[in-house]
Design a protein with these regions (language model features):
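Flexible, acidic/Gly-rich N-terminal and inter-domain linker regions that tether
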Residues: 1-80
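Gly/Ser/Thr-rich loops at beta-strand to alpha-helix junctions
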Residues: 16-19, 89, 176
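Conserved Radical SAM active-site core
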Residues: 54-56, 63-78, 95, 99-178
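Cysteine-centered iron-sulfur cluster-binding motifs in ferredoxin-type domains/subunits
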Residues: 85-94
Length: 178
């Protein structure tokens, strides 16, 4: 599958992202892209009011924020836990995706810049366990696609690789991995 590099038409971001390394990186990377400061990445009135016909146009926006809640959901199908991680939504427009049904709530890509805090919780949970735990970090998005914007995949691997009793997994349909 060939995906063109994502270039957002606009960025909505929480001011707090300026306090994070990844937030600063993304603001610099997209310094020429129009930006709007928002209060909350979950409640962007301008996006909520859009009509269904605007779906593809909405997906051209990038939302950047700080993940406030980080609850692990027990999952005994493919992992021990489903873990909200560094993104939600997607830049692709696959017609079979469940996000299409809920587009105005979450189909556009939301990036979360507090990755250190999120990964630290995963590592601490694994370290406390007597058995190996598997954490699925891709149930809300596609980490491979997100990685083309954030470089979070190599960052995650480097910072997690020596974690005892911990495994990470994520589903993807993309192959943009070096």
């Amino acid at each position: 599958m060939v995906i063109k590099m994502f270039k957002p038409k606009g960025i909505f971001y929480e001011k707090e992202i300026e306090n994070y390394e990844l937030g600063k990186y993304l603001l610099k990377k997209y310094e020429d892209t129009p930006k709007v400061i928002i209060e909350n990445h979950n409640n962007i009135e301008e996006m909520r009011k859009r009509q269904n016909k605007d779906f593809m146009d909405m997906k051209r926006n990038l939302i950047i924020g700080v993940r406030k809640t980080h609850n692990f959901v027990p999952n005994h199908k493919t992992s021990d836990y489903l873990v909200p991680y560094t993104s939600s939504g997607c830049t692709a427009a696959c017609m079979y995706c469940y996000l299409v049904c809920n587009y105005n709530k979450c189909a556009y890509l939301r990036l979360f810049v507090n990755r250190e805090k999120m990964l630290d919780k995963i590592i601490k949970t694994a370290q406390k366990s007597d058995k190996t735990l598997t954490f699925e970090i891709g149930s809300n998005s596609d980490l491979i696609l997100e990685n083309t914007i954030t470089n979070n995949l190599p960052w995650t691997i480097e910072n997690f690789k020596n974690t005892p009793n911990g495994r990470l997994t994520f589903p993807t349909k993309f192959d943009m991995v070096d």
